[in-house]
C-alpha cells in the first residue's frame, strides 16, 4: 500500500523511535520469527494509524485481533486464531499519541485527532495526484 509506505517514511523522520526491544520480538504468538525488515516498527505504526482512520474508535484488543493470525498445528488439526502482541500495538499508539495524531476516547478506544486526520488526508491526496499523473483516467476521482 502506497499510503502506508509513505506514511512510514514520514514517521521515521518524526519523533517516534522504535523501542530497543523491537529488534528481537515476534509480532505475536502466531509468528515463527521476528520481522525481517529493519523498519518494520514504523510500517506497523503507519498501518495502525490507517486502521484507526477507517475503524476508529478502536481498542488495542480489537487491533490485536486484526493483526493476529491463525496458527496451524504442524501435523494435524484446524487453525486456531492467535492475537498479535499487545505491547507492540500499545507502544505504537503511545508514540502516535505523543505526536498528536491519535487521542483516547473514554471506554471506546482511540480515534484520529484533527492533526492525524489532516495528515492522512493530505498524503492520500498527494498519492492520488501522483496516480493521476501516471494514469489520466483516474482524474474522475479527484
Language-model features and meaning:
Residues 94-107:
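A short, conserved structural fragment
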Amino acid at each position: 500500500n502506497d499510503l502506508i509506505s509513505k506514511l512510514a517514511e514520514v514517521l521515521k523522520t518524526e519523533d517516534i523511535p522504535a523501542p530497543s526491544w523491537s529488534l528481537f520480538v515476534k509480532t505475536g504468538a502466531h509468528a515463527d520469527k521476528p520481522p525481517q525488515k529493519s523498519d518494520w516498527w514504523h510500517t506497523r505504526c503507519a498501518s495502525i494509524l490507517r486502521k484507526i482512520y477507517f475503524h476508529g474508535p478502536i481498542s488495542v484488543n480489537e487491533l490485536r485481533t486484526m493483526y493476529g493470525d491463525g496458527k496451524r498445528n504442524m501435523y494435524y488439526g484446524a487453525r486456531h486464531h492467535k492475537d498479535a502482541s499487545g505491547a507492540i500495538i500499545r507502544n505504537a499508539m503511545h508514540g502516535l499519541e505523543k505526536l498528536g495524531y491519535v487521542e483516547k476516547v473514554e471506554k471506546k478506544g482511540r480515534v484520529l485527532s484533527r492533526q492525524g486526520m489532516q495528515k492522512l488526508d493530505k498524503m492520500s491526496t498527494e498519492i492520488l495526484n501522483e496516480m493521476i499523473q501516471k494514469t489520466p483516467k483516474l482524474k474522475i476521482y479527484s
